Every structure is written in C-alpha cells, then in structure tokens.
C-alpha cells in the first residue's frame, strides 16, 4: 500500500485502541529539552495577471500561465498594448517594486544558498537535528521566473534547484529522516481556516506539484510528514485535509494550547493576554495539573504571552469529528514557542530557558520549536547568522538537544488518550490582533471606524455615532451588518462566488467523466490522494485543451477555474492594510477564474449538485455577554449584554432558497475535549449507531433562527463613504459576490451553546457548516474598585453591541431658519447675498434662494450671487435651509436691494461659431469665467444677440469663442464696444447699429472663420485673458484720497485671520469714474500693453466661495474700490488667481475678502506681494506657484530611543494603526525622523507618534499619557516640527 494509505490505516488502528508508533507503556524519557527550527520562505504571486483575450487564439497544448514575478517586472517596465490596469497616478499595477524586494540579501540567501549550507553544518554537529523549511509554491515559481527573465541581479543560475534537491535527498538524520525537511504548506500562502477546506486542499496539491517541478526537486520529491499552517494559523477544521494528504503532524502556536485550559487565569483581565479578548469559555476544554502558568513578555513589544508549561511545550493529539458521521481525523499538534520565535526573529538568537524549570514533570520530553520567517527583510530573521544560530546557540545550550520533529515523535508520540482541543488562531505578532482566535487581522466584520462616521452620515443622511462603553468612552470601531463595510471582509464575500462556480464546475466535470484522472505513478501519489479527481498537474500548470474535443490534451474549465482562483487569497494581500493595490489583487484572480467556470457551469446548470458555498459561521461579539477588547471594537474595552449575531457570506450558482442558523444549549456550563456529543448534528442517532463518547442528554434540541440578507451587489466595488478604497476597487472591479446573511440572537444568558448554518439552493442541494461553540455570558456586571466584573447578580446591564439592528428613526426635523440675510448690490445687474449658517439636528446640506417669492437656485454655501438682473429695479430675497432628508426650514427674514441704473451694450454676432460665447468685462472690471456666456439666437437670421448691463462703465471689453477652446480675440488685443447697439462679424469688423436683415440666406460660410486660439488664452484672469485698454485711457474725475473711518469689520468664520479695525489702510469712499473722451470707432484699435512689472497672485481660502483682492500699488495712495477685483479660478485646485500690472512699481499691498464683508487681511497688517508669482493659503505666503497640499513632520526623539528604531505616525488618517508601514518615518543623518504626507488643507487631523505599538506610544516627560496632537493643515507645503518627550515603555 502507499505511504498515505499506510498512515490512514495506522490512524484507524489507533482509533480502535491499537498503537501507532510507540508501545502503550512509554519508556522513561530524559529530562533534556528537544529543540528544532521551522523557517518559512514565501513571496506572493504579486500580480497573477493573464490576458484572457489570448486564450481562444492560443494553440492547443500551449502553456496557460498567469504572470510570475519575473514576468510582472517585465510587464511594469513595458506594459503591453491594451493593458488595462493602472493606478490613479498613471503607473501600471501592481505598485510593488519587485526588483527591490527580491534584491535584498534576505531573499537571495534564503532562496539560493543558506538552507542547504546550514543543513550541511547541522549534519556534522547535531545528528538528530532537522531544518523544517517551507518554500511556497509561488516563491519557487517566482524565483525560477526571475532567473529565466534575468531581471534581478544575483538570480542567474538555471540549476538553482539542484542544491535543494541534493540536500533533501542526501542529508539524513540519525533516524533516517530528511535533515532538510521541506514540509507541507499551502502553495499560495492561503489560510486554510479562512478559505475553507476545498480551497486549502487544492492549494496544498498545487504546492506538492510545484515541489515536483523539474527546476526544483523533480521526481525525487517525497511528501513530508509535517505541515506549517500559513501565518501559523491553525484550526481543527482543517485536519481532514491534512489526513487526506497523509500528513502526520502540524506546528501550532503554544498559546493556542494554553488558552484552552480550564484553569486559564485571566478571564476577568481582558486585554492582558496578547492584548486581545479573553478566550471564550467554550474553548476551555482541557485540564493539566502539572507545571505552572508563565507570563512571557515579547521582546521589545507590548504583548505578553501566557502559557502553562509543560502542557504548552509537549506534543498532543488534536482532532476533528465529522458532524454528520462522527468519524474522527487527527494529527499530532506540536507547540511553537511564540514569544521566543519572535525574539529570535528580532535579535537573531534565542535559548530554551523558559522551559527548563518544567523538565521531567511529565513522561514526554519537552520540545522547544522556534518558527519564523527565513527570508524576512526586517529584523534578523532574514540573516544567515540567525539560521546558523540554531546550531551555534539554541542547540549548543546545556540541557538542550537539537532534534527535529520527526526525530522527536519517534520516541515522544503522545499517548492515544492525550487528545486536546486547540483554540483557533495564528502567529503572535500581528500587533493589531495578536493570535486572535477571531482572526481579525485578516478579516473584520462590516463596520464603521470612529473616524469614518462623519463621511458615513453625510453619504447616508444619518446621524449615527460610535456607541460608548460602560465607562463612557466611544469605541474605535462599530460593527454594522446593515450598513458597515470593510475591504478585507469583501474578499471573503467575493470568494464564495468564485469558489462555488469552481466547485460546481469540478462536480459537473467529474460526474460526466467518472474515470477522468487518478494517481498512476509514485510521484502522483506523493502529490495527491487516491481516487477520481481533477488532474493536479493541469490545475497547477495548465496547457490549452481542445475545446472542440472535450478539452483533450489539456486543462478543462474546472482545472482552469481552480488554477486562476488559487493566487487570490494570499494572506499577505490582507496583512499590510490596503497598501495601495493589495486590496484588489484577489479580485484580479476571482475575475479570471470566473471567466472559465461561469460559462461552463451556466451551460450545464441543470446538472448542479453542489450545495451553496457558505463561509464558516462568524459571530460577533466574540464573547457575548462578557468582556471584549479586540480590533473589532477598535481596541476599546466593551462589556456587552447577552445579544450577539451569527453571520456568514454565501453564494450558489443556482441561487440560495433558504438559509438559517441552528442553535442548541448544553446542559452543563463546560465541555471536555474527548466528548463527541457537541461535535455532531444528531447525537442520539449516532450514539445509537455506536459512535463512542456521545451522551445525548448533555445537549438540547436545535432551535432555528432565520437569517437576514444584505444584497452586496450594490457595494461590490466599494462604498461612497470610503472614497479612497472605492477608487482602487474600481480599478479592478469584481463581478460576482456572495451576500451577507446574519441573525441576531438574545435568548441565552450564562449558557454554553452550539450553532451551525444550513443553506439550501434552488435545486435542493444542502450545505451544513461545521458546528461551533460559544459561551454566552451573563451580560450583567458589578463595578468594584473601578473594574467591571461579569456576574449573574450584577445590576449593571452590559452595552448593546449594535447600533443599526433596528430601523433608523426617520429624520423629520427641519433645520433652523437662516438668520441675518444681507443683500448687497454689486452692480446694475447683480446682487450678492450672504447669511448666517443654519443649524440642524443632523446636518444642513444646502439653501434655497428665492427672489420675489420664486426659487431661483440653491447653494451649499452661505452666500449666493444673483446675476442677470435689470437695472433700476427693486428685488426682495428670502432663503430656506434644507437637510439630507429634504426637510426645509421656514423662510428667512426678507432682504431687499435695488439695482442702480446701468449702461447697456447690445452685440449682434454674425454666426461664425455654431454656438458662440462672449467672454467679457465692463472695461476695467472683472471678467466672466471662461468661456463666458453663450450668445442666444437673434431675431435676425444668421446672427446671435446678447445685451449686457455694464453698470457705470462706458465700454465693454470682450472676445469670442466656440465654448471648446477656439478663440477670436482680435489677435490677443480683444474687442471694445461702447454703449448702445453694435454688429460684429467674424472678419473683425464692428459696425454701429443692428444688422440689416439679408434678402436671402447666405449659402456660403464666412470667408474668415475665427479658429486661432488667442496668444494669451482668455480663461482665468484679466491678464491671462484680455488685457488691453481702450486707445484713450480714462482719467479719474475724483481722486481716491478719502480714508474710511472703518473698513471691513466681519470676522471670517473659518479662515484663521483677524478682521482689521481700520484696514486696508486707504480705501476710497467715492469710486473713481472714467469717461472716455470718445467712444470707440467702428473698428477700435487697442492700445499696446504698457511695459513694466506684474504680480501673479494665487489665493486659496476654503471659506470663500468667491475671492476678491483689494489692493494698492507700492508708492501709490489709491486703493481699488472695495471689495476690489474678483479673482478667477486657476489651474491649481482650490486656488483663485489674478495677474496685476505693476508698471514701474515693485510690488503691491493687498487684503482679501469674499465680496460680502468677510475679510482676510493678515490680522490687520495686510499682505505684501512682490513681482512674479506668489501663493497664499491659510496665512502662509510663499514665493512661486502653489505647491500641492502637504505636511512634512520633523520629529526629534529622546536619546533613549533604540538605535534604528522605527517611528510611526498614527492617527485619524490611518484608523490609528500604530505600525502602519505607509506612515513609517525616515531617520535622517541628523537624527531627525521625518515624513511628508498629502493632507488636505482645512481638514483637521489628530495623531500621535509610536515606535510600532501602543506600548511604545509617546508620553509626557513624566510618563503620563498625553492628549492627541491636532493639526489643521494650512494648505500648500507646510512643515511641522515636533519633539517626543518620552516613550511609554521607557
């Protein structure tokens, strides 16, 4: 029989009471400690891209491949024609600098030299030692791809796999095991407990097929006995997959053993153990009376790991019981020293000292397993010295023997009855959720971060706020199934759709091909299990099959669907937050998988016998009725009442017709790991069938709860209140997604429960999830000495966990009436309005403007300009406020204004442009915004006509355009029209009076169509648009010599400026007038622009919807007429601009206002501008054009800061992630740490400095916590200088 068959036979024998490896009576063991190392090497397929358009034209038998990393480097350097994926900044996706990644010595050493070199050294000095190493399938293919492409220095040996093969096959331990043991792993770094067993099985088969590729181990590949779970993330749910592939043992984090002991000491100390919630009491199933509890602080970190030795330092059996049949699967669980593994990865060496006090307390030898990355570019994990320190330091220590896991189990296999329960969870140092059994580093229930509520409420028209804990503190994250969102959670909803299509394609294909493929040679059997299945070589390395001949000679649609699906769920895509485009890498693979599975399944849907894909049931909170302090609460300690939710994501190709949660209560408040009663759906039935360890009296009947559904199709590619995430998601839009199903349950208190989800599709196919357990606490608390303690006798009801589980109360409250409406006459044809902001119970979203009782417009701001009015006319204005729900306030008090008499200019324009625009200003006044105003058709055929009120001015300066950038501006000199009526033809001819109607419609277009763009495009300001004055310059009849008693007095509501008491220093009370001595002739001749200096001023003030500059030239006494000259939009976002001729002056003095009495005058000192360009925002005046809004933080740190310690900025802009790599500061040669961020002007942020965790956050010099730092960026380029007084851990 095969090796796998032999092993399964051995397990069966063990279950029946026989022996596996050691005799029933274990011999005495020595007191020394066994020690070994596990090194993890991996790089993702960073961009598993395949041009689907090439599939149909690919010849049969040709390889079908997504890009490995060598090809990705080429793709980024030279994107192919039609390549569709680019970041918002225009660079090709992915963002990753792969050349830099792979060039690091940690990569080249771990992949190309260290492992076999160190194995040779161990071979000569430690006869029982093994190096257990993972080389993921993706990193093997990536390294080979880079060598083939030759695009990374150092990767140049085509036979790079030969030293690996030689070391694996030739170096043996004293017991005959592989010295270099390439243990099992999921090929694409997928986390089995999160992706599910179907996905994990395929990914592990892929890994085996990759190990057996000719460029790596080839035909010499032999399946290892061991397994390393991705991110050290283990669950008993994956044991059937390990058994199916003949795997005998798995490493598991040691604290996941300890957190299942019934004497766990920290249930009432939430957050103490690795900064997460205490274990749910349903996990406390094991008993150990030997040894003691030990707290192990992680080196240089805030987390403290709690373990009980020797229970957490000896191997035990762990098992899975099939809930339908009661059949058992089991493997040996080997504990990994979590804290010490981190320490070696950080410092480069570690000893087994923590275990020495507990030697010889039990029959088994303790084992000290150090497991960490072998290729990590940070810390010391990716160092040859660290690899060698296993033998030089750890195994050289007194009382410690280098002994691989296979060697250890040869004489230390657990007794058959030594079966324990292990808690779900992962590696210890994810920082935000260290080894959390809820896996919150890689997914998070749909929710709303505290800093997102403002945007959430604005988009949804709601008034939600974070709920508060019993101490009155707002939580950092609020779970909301109805309205929340999270990019990581989205991936698991997307997965259910692609997974179900792939599984259904596989089911249909294998049913149609009952003898399709099964292992036929020894290498096949090393890679996969026995029986009819998809071809593992084709789902790992497909070639084109013949679609016209049942895909003969290559991969069928099911194999292609799996091949393209497997790269999707690399856990690294969710490890570093959204990290530019990591969040959409799964969608790329999902879409490519669906390209092959969906059409195939759709054509054969009548043959669907696959049940719905249902993600393993989730619950929130993790500890119902008890204490929780996890990432899902935003690390806010919550003491909840007894309500909780069960939820999942589910999808079926035929549609889900029914889905429900089933819950049953236990008789007792505790359970035991050896008991099978609570592990099966039907205890009575299976007990009657002879399944051992079942007592039906221990559990009650199942109670069914229907599930609510949230259709996620509308949110498949993001939500509007998370715009940055949405922008990236829409670069690679997903196409199919599972829905969210959830049930709220509050019928239990102080009880142990089982639950599972059952779903049925439209064809009657049923899926039942695994059974899980939860202990629902009392939900009531006592308060003593400032601490809340759960108690059924408590008088304080816990906080309700949800805020959107009941329908939102409709907002029917109208905003308050706007006050202080002011109407200011601007000229003969326009009136400016301003008013005080109204208030509302949620938020005012805008205002309706009424003129003479008729609504004329709306605005989101508190000002409005009404244009196009008649001269010498009285107008009455009123304003209403409205909110997002459409509630309207009452009318404001009325404000009236009467326009003065004004001069008019009527222009007939002979059609040269099909839709002509006129861009104009009253001579010396303010220009319209380009392209100006469309000229309506005239009563005279072939002409357009417009009448313009120019107020007191006597001339109109203008040019014409087609609205799309083609201009007629009199060769850059513009046109001048006096008052009265004029006729213009595109030949440049201006004639007094209206045109004479032609006797016949012209049939020929004008001979001179005005197409050239003016030499100075008239788009923004009076200089960048028309600048030329009339031939005869007007002279003022009244000199501007009178100084006002008091000028602008209103204080801006937003802009941080001070209103002057009497500024600007000189403002004329009588506007200068100018009357030309004669009107322009029929063809006016413009005066040349005077030679001299000019000043171009860019001004940004988010409080002003309109900006005016009120100024005087240096050496002059005359100011412009208040409010001055209106500035126009510029090419720089948010900035208004103007260019002012200075003549012989060298500068000007100015103040700014909104045209309605709100001033920015530099605190009463005004601003001074020289020649050339200047930019002003938030009081920050710089020379030159505007710079992008940015803030450079320069941080001085205490002298006690560890050398080269990382310093991070954390705050409202990154959800308070204390170790966000995107906010890592750079240390300069002067010791100053700095980072530059693009923070928008005017948007306040709060923040602090950390060294990578909240244990190392900055404090006051006394060590006391400090309040959050705050900053409202002024705009433009800004530098903030900070000093850290002290770190919390010092």
Curated annotation (Swiss-Prot):
Location in or out of the cell: Secreted
A GO biological-process term: starch catabolic process
Residue ranges of every copy of the Fibronectin type-III domain listed in the record: 817-902
GO molecular function ontology, one term from the record: alpha-amylase activity
InterPro entries from the UniProt entry: Carb-bd-like_fold (IPR013784), CBM20 (IPR002044), CBM25 (IPR005085), FN3_dom (IPR003961), FN3_sf (IPR036116), Glyco_hydro/deAcase_b/a-brl (IPR011330), Ig-like_fold (IPR013783)
Variation of activity with pH: Optimum pH is 6.0.
Signal peptide: 1-31
Domain of life: Bacteria
Domain CBM20: 1183-1289
Reactions catalysed, as given in the entry: Endohydrolysis of (1->4)-alpha-D-glucosidic linkages in polysaccharides containing three or more (1->4)-alpha-linked D-glucose units
Cellular component annotations (GO), alphabetically ordered: extracellular region
Keywords: Carbohydrate metabolism, Glycosidase, Hydrolase, Polysaccharide degradation, Repeat, Secreted, Signal
Composition-biased stretches (Low complexity): 994-1008, 1016-1031
Pfam families listed in its UniProt record: CBM_25, fn3
Location of the region described as Disordered in the Swiss-Prot/TrEMBL record: 994-1037
Group of enzyme by EC: hydrolase
Temperature-activity profile: Optimum temperature is 40 degrees Celsius.
Main location, first listed in the record: secreted
E.C. designation(s): 3.2.1.1
Record-annotated active site: 231 (nucleophile), 373 (proton donor)
Chain positions covered by the region annotation CBM25: 902-978, 1092-1171
Role description: Acts on maltooligosaccharides that have a degree of polymerization (DP) of 4 or more, amylose, and soluble or raw starch to produce glucose and maltooligosaccharides up to DP5 by a hydrolysis reaction. Also acts on maltooligosyl trehaloses that have DP5 or more to produce trehalose as the major hydrolysis product.
Protein name from the UniProt record: Alpha-amylase
Organism: Niallia circulans (Bacillus circulans)
């Amino acid at each position: 029989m095969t090796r796998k068959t032999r092993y399964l036979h051995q397990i069966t024998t063990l279950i029946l009471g026989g022996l596996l490896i050691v005799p029933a009576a274990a011999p005495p063991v020595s007191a020394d400690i066994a020690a070994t190392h596990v090194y993890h090497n991996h790089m993702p397929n960073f961009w598993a891209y395949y041009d689907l358009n090439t599939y149909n034209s690919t010849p049969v038998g040709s390889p079908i491949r997504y890009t490995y990393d060598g090809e990705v480097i080429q793709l980024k350097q030279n994107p192919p024609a039609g390549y569709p994926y680019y970041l918002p900044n225009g660079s090709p996706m992915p963002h990753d600098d792969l050349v830099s990644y792979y060039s690091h010595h940690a990569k080249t050493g771990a992949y190309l030299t260290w492992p076999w070199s160190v194995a040779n050294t161990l071979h000569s000095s430690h006869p029982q030692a093994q190096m257990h190493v993972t080389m993921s399938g993706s990193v093997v293919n990536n390294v080979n791809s880079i060598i083939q492409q030759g695009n990374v220095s150092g990767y140049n040996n085509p036979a790079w796999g030969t030293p690996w093969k030689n070391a694996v096959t030739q170096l043996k331990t004293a017991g005959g095991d592989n010295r270099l043991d390439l243990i099992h792993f999921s090929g694409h770094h997928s986390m089995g407990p999160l992706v599910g067993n179907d996905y994990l099985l395929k990914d592990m088969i892929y890994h085996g097929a990759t190990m057996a590729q000719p460029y790596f181990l080839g035909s010499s590949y032999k399946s290892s006995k061991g397994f390393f779970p991705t991110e050290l993330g283990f669950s008993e749910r994956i044991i059937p997959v390990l058994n199916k592939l003949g795997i005998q043992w798995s490493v598991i984090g040691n604290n996941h053993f300890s957190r299942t002991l019934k004497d766990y000491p920290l249930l009432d100390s939430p957050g103490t153990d690795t900064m997460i919630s205490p274990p749910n009491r349903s996990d406390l199933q094991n008993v150990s009376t030997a040894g003691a509890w030990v707290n192990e602080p992680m080196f240089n970190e805030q987390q403290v790991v709690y373990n009980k030795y020797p229970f957490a330092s000896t191997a035990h059996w762990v098992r899975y019981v099939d809930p339908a049949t009661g059949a058992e699967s089991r493997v040996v669980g080997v504990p990994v020293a979590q804290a010490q593994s981190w320490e070696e990865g950080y410092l480069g060496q570690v000893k087994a000292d923590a275990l020495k006090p507990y030697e010889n307390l039990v029959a088994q030898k303790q084992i000290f397993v150090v497991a960490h990355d072998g290729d990590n570019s940070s810390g010391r994990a990716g160092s040859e010295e660290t690899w060698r320190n296993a033998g030089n330091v750890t195994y050289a220590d007194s009382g410690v023997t280098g002994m691989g896991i296979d060697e250890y189990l040869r004489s230390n296999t657990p007794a058959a009855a030594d079966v324990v329960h292990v808690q779900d969870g992962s590696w210890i140092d994810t920082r935000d959720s260290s080894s959390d059994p809820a896996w919150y580093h890689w997914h998070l229930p749909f929710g709303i971060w505290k800093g997102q509520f403002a945007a959430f409420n604005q988009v949804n028209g709601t008034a939600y706020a974070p709920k508060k804990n019993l101490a009155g503190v707002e939580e950092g994250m609020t779970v909301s199934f109805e309205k929340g969102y999270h990019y990581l959670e989205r991936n698991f909803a997307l997965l259910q759709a692609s997974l179900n299509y792939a599984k259904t394609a596989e089911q249909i294909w294998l049913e149609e091909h009952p003898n399709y493929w099964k292992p036929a040679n020894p290498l096949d059997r090393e890679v996969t299990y026995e029986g009819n299945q998809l071809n593992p070589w084709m789902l790992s390395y497909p070639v084109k099959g013949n679609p016209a001949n049942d895909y003969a000679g290559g991969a069928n649609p099911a194999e292609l669907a799996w091949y393209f699906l497997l790269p999707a769920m690399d856990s690294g895509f969710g490890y570093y937050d959204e990290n530019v485009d990591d969040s959409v890498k799964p969608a790329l693979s999902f879409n490519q998988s669906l390209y092959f599975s969906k059409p195939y399944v759709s054509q054969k849907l009548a043959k669907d016998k696959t049940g719905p894909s249902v993600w393993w049931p989730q619950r929130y909170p993790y500890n119902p009725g008890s204490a929780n302090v996890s990432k899902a609460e935003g690390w806010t300690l919550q003491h909840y009442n007894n309500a909780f939710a069960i939820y999942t994501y589910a999808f079926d190709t035929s549609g889900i017709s029914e889905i429900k949660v089933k819950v049953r209560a236990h008789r007792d408040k505790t359970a035991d790991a050896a008991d099978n009663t609570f592990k099966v759906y039907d205890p009575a039935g299976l007990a009657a069938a002879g399944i051992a360890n079942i007592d039906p009296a221990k559990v009650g009947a199942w109670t069914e709860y229907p599930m609510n559904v949230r259709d996620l199709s509308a949110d498949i590619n993001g939500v509007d209140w998370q715009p940055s995430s949405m922008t990236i998601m829409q670069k690679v839009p997903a196409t199919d997604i599972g829905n969210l199903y959830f049930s709220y349950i509050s019928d239990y208190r102080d009880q142990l429960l089982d639950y599972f989800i059952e779903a049925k599709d439209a064809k009657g196919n049923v899926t039942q999830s695994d059974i899980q357990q939860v202990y629902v606490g009392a939900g009531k608390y006592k308060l003593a000495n400032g601490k809340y303690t759960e108690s059924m006798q408590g008088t304080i009801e816990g906080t309700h966990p949800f805020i959107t589980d009941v329908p939102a109360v409709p907002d029917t409250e109208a905003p308050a009436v706007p006050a202080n409406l002011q109407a200011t006459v601007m000229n003969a044809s326009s009136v400016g309005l301003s008013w005080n902001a109204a208030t509302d119970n949620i938020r005012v979203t805008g205002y309706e403007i009424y003129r003479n009782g008729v609504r004329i417009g709306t605005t989101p701001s508190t000002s409005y300009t009404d244009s196009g009015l008649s001269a010498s006319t009285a107008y009455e204005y009123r304003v209403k406020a409205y909110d997002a729900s459409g509630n309207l306030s009452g009318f404001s008090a009325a404000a009236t204004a009467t326009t003065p008499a004004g001069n008019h200019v009527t222009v007939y324009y002979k059609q040269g442009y099909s839709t002509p625009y006129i861009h104009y200003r009253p001579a010396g006044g303010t220009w319209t915004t380009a392209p100006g105003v469309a000229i309506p058709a005239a009563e005279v055929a072939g002409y357009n006509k417009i009448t313009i009120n120019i107020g007191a001015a006597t001339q109109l300066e203008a040019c014409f355009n087609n609205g799309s950038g083609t201009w007629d501006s009199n060769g850059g000199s513009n046109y001048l029209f006096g008052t009265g009526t004029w006729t213009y033809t595109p030949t440049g001819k201006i004639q007094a009076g209206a045109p004479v109607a032609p006797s016949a419609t012209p049939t020929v277009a004008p001979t001179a169509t005005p197409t050239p763009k003016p030499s100075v495009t008239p788009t923004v300001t009076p200089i960048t648009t028309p600048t030329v004055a009339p031939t005869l310059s007007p002279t003022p009849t009244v000199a501007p010599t009178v100084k006002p008693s008091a000028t602008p007095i209103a204080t801006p509501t937003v802009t941080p400026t001070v209103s002057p008491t009497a500024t600007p220093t000189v403002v004329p009370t009588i506007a200068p007038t100018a009357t030309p001595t004669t009107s322009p002739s029929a063809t006016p001749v413009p005066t040349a622009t005077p030679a001299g200096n000019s000043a171009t001023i860019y001004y940004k003030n988010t409080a002003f919807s309109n900006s005016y500059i009120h100024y005087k030239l240096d050496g002059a006494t005359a100011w412009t007429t208040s409010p001055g000259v209106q500035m126009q939009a510029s090419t720089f976002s948010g900035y208004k601009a103007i260019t002012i001729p200075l003549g012989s002056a060298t500068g000007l003095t100015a103040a700014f206002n909104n045209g309605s009495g709100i001033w920015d005058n530099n605190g009463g000192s005004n601003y001074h501008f020289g020649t050339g360009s200047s930019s002003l925002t938030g009081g920050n005046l710089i020379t030159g054009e505007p710079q992008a809004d940015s803030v450079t933080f320069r941080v001085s740190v205490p002298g006690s800061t560890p050398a080269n310690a990382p310093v991070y900025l954390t705050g409202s802009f990154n959800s308070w992630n204390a170790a966000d790599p995107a906010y890592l500061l750079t240390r300069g040669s002067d010791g100053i740490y700095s980072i530059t961020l693009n923070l928008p002007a005017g948007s306040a942020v709060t923040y602090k400095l950390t060294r990578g965790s909240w244990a190392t956050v900055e404090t006051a010099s006394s060590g006391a916590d400090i309040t959050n730092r705050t900053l409202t960026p002024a705009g433009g380029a800004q530098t903030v200088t900070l000093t850290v007084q002290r770190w919390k851990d010092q």
